[in-house]
């Protein structure tokens, strides 16, 4: 597909968002486990409401629905949880793969278990490429309204040609139905390029309003579900064609359109795996497992497969990491300073080559697939410690984690960067900062928004790419950030102020993708400038205090010399 038609298709898909929604595994490296069971920037929103409001409304509406399920599950499991605690929390978990010892005891170092590539491919065949014989699409709310619980095919539910057997489901447009049938036929014949072309045609029909039989009365969420299904089919087509780079944006868009469906996140994880972006694949798999539970999924076999995939991606990310090593410390009590020092001492003994700089993440707790149970109160949690060979590779973490406004700059004049400075900062962000943040978030479900969500850094990275006119990369980063923004309300409770910020970020991201320009600066750039001004003021304050201290010391020294001179006389 040439650049012109690609741009046209992207604009068509963005119009759907705007008009209808708006918004070979190697495990030779070792990982250590320690054990003991264990004011946002104010801004006017009026300009953004018409652009980004509907996506946030849909996201919040779906969040309420899934939160209701979560509360019901929590109530059902609460008694059992307290009973287990009363019987004794010291009882070992039977299926844990890592041996657990007391924190004060000897640290155990063990090789990561090898997960064969065949096992990973089996998970993908069972959960990612499933239901290829039928044209199916996603209507989450329909299942909720009928009171039935989603099964392993929860959201991919019905062939449009047999939709009359499910009277509670909307009827899709007949021309769109024909396009989807042709695409499905090509796919079954393994003509993946032709199938992708047909699915792109179907996507263009969606952008023109040909989605459901009653377009004027169709809920935006149902339209989003159909478009999300088409995006997922494009993902599988490109994966079959071994072109994960073409599948990536479609995987992101399917999540923007329907963030509640766990398979969308698992497909995104598969794309990341094919691109060897293992930390991001691990996070997507973690979210997929959580969404499966949150949506009422009760088939333990599916959750085990997702957790296996999540575990394999974490292990591969650790194996591929060259600049740092990692240690997870299970705990159940309050984190004390002396415990952190013990963890760092243990890390130094175990990984002396990575002790140049150590960082312990206190912003949020971490979970591992070997022990996580979303229905427990709370799940087994871990303290993450990273150690670096080079001090410069990790010292930025302290700065990012200690501020409310996430910004990064290494220049004394951040407001007037030359092209060389921009290239240098872009490479630093893309090769050194973002990969580490992505790894941290691969076991962290819900960091605070926006400080430790990682979204703001990605959007600021996209701005650097834009300044260097790297449009294709910028588009991918923004699409990924939008997928993460759409998922945030499902992972954590957000305040009204945070919801407004999320809405503005989503609207600005969509405007950027569509090439829209206005007189207002992008929200993430405004936040970055505020942070840079803060840094500048702090530097002035530090400089003033240092100068004052030196001046006082000189005066005191001069005074003492005068006294000595007088005494000598």
From Swiss-Prot:
Miscellaneous: Association analysis reveals significant frequency of a synonymous (Ser-225) sequence polymorphism among clinical groups with different sperm traits: the donor group, which has the highest sperm count and motility level, has a significant higher polymorphism frequency compared to normal and asthenozoopermia groups.
Residues of the region (Disordered) are 67-96
Involvement in disorder? Spermatogenic failure 6: An infertility disorder caused by spermatogenesis defects. The most prominent feature is the malformation of the acrosome, which can be totally absent in most severe cases. Additional features are an abnormal nuclear shape and abnormal arrangement of the mitochondria of the spermatozoon.
Q: Which residues form a coiled coil?
A: none
Q: Coding gene?
A: SPATA16
Which stretches are tagged as biased composition: Basic and acidic residues? 67-92
Q: What InterPro entries is this protein classified in?
A: SPATA16, TPR-like_helical_dom_sf
**Which GO CC annotations does the UniProt entry carry?**
acrosomal vesicle; Golgi apparatus
**Would the keyword Secreted be found if you checked this record's keyword annotation?**
no
Q: Output the PANTHER family linked to this UniProt entry.
A: SPERMATOGENESIS-ASSOCIATED PROTEIN 16 (PTHR47228:SF1)
- What keywords would UniProt list here? Cytoplasmic vesicle, Developmental protein, Differentiation, Disease variant, Golgi apparatus, Spermatogenesis
Tissue-level expression: Expressed in testis.
What is its biological role? Essential for spermiogenesis and male fertility. Involved in the formation of sperm acrosome during spermatogenesis.
Subcellular location, record wording: Golgi apparatus; Cytoplasmic vesicle, Secretory vesicle, Acrosome
Which protein family is it in? Belongs to the SPATA16 family.
Listed name of the protein:
Spermatogenesis-associated protein 16
Q: Name one GO biological process term.
A: spermatogenesis
């Amino acid at each position: 597909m040439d650049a012109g038609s690609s741009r046209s298709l992207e604009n068509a898909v963005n119009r759907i968002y705007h008009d209808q929604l708006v918004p070979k595994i190697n495990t030779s490296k070792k990982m250590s486990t320690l054990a003991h069971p264990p004011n946002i920037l104010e801004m006017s929103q009026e300009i953004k409401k018409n652009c980004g409001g509907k996506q946030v409304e849909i996201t919040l509406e779906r969040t309420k629905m899934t939160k209701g399920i979560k509360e019901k599950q929590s109530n059902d499991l609460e008694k059992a949880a307290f009973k287990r605690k009363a019987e004794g929390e010291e009882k070992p978990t039977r299926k844990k793969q890592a041996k657990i010892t007391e924190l004060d005891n000897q640290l155990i170092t063990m090789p990561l278990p090898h997960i064969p590539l065949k096992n990973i491919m089996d998970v993908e065949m069972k959960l990612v490429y499933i239901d290829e014989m039928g044209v199916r699409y996603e209507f989450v709310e329909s299942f909720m309204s009928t009171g039935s619980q989603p099964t392993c095919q929860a959201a991919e539910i019905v062939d449009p040609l047999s939709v009359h057997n499910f009277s509670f489901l909307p009827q899709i447009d007949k021309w769109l139905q024909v396009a989807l049938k042709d695409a499905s036929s090509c796919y079954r014949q393994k003509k993946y390029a032709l199938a992708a072309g047909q699915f792109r045609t179907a996507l263009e029909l969606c952008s023109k309003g040909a989605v459901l039989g009653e377009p004027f009365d169709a809920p935006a969420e149902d339209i989003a579900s159909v478009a999300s299904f088409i995006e997922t089919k494009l993902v599988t087509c490109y994966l079959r064609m071994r072109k994960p780079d073409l599948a990536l944006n479609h995987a992101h868009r399917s999540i923007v359109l329907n963030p509640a469906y766990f398979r969308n996140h698992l497909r995104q994880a598969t794309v990341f795996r094919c691109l060897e972006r293992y930390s991001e694949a691990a996070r997507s798999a973690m979210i997929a497992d959580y969404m499966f539970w949150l949506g009422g999924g009760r088939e333990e076999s599916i959750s085990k497969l997702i957790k296996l995939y999540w575990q394999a991606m974490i292990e591969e990310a650790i194996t591929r990491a060259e600049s740092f090593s990692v240690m997870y410390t299970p705990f159940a009590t309050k984190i004390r300073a002396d415990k952190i020092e013990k963890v760092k001492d243990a890390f130094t003994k175990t990984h002396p080559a990575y002790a140049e700089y150590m960082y312990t993440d206190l912003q949020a707790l971490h979970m591992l697939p070997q022990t996580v149970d979303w229905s427990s109160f709370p799940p087994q949690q871990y303290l993450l410690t990273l150690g670096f060979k080079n001090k410069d590779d990790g010292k930025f973490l302290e700065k990012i984690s200690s501020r409310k406004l996430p910004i990064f700059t290494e220049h004394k004049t951040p407001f007037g960067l030359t092209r060389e400075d921009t290239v240098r900062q872009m490479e630093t962000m893309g090769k050194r900062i973002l990969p580490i943040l992505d790894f941290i978030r691969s076991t962290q479900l819900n960091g605070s928004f926006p400080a430790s969500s990682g979204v703001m850094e990605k959007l600021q990275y996209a701005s650097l790419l834009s300044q260097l006119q790297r449009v294709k990369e910028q588009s991918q980063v923004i699409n990924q950030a939008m997928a993460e923004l759409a998922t945030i309300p499902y992972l954590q409770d957000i305040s009204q102020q945070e919801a407004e910020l999320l809405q503005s970020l989503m609207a600005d991201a969509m405007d950027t993708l569509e090439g829209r320009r206005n007189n207002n600066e992008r929200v993430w750039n405004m936040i970055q400038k505020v942070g840079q001004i803060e840094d500048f003021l702090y530097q002035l304050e530090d400089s003033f205090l240092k100068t004052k201290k030196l001046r006082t010391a000189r005066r005191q020294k001069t005074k003492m010399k005068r006294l000595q001179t007088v005494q000598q006389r």
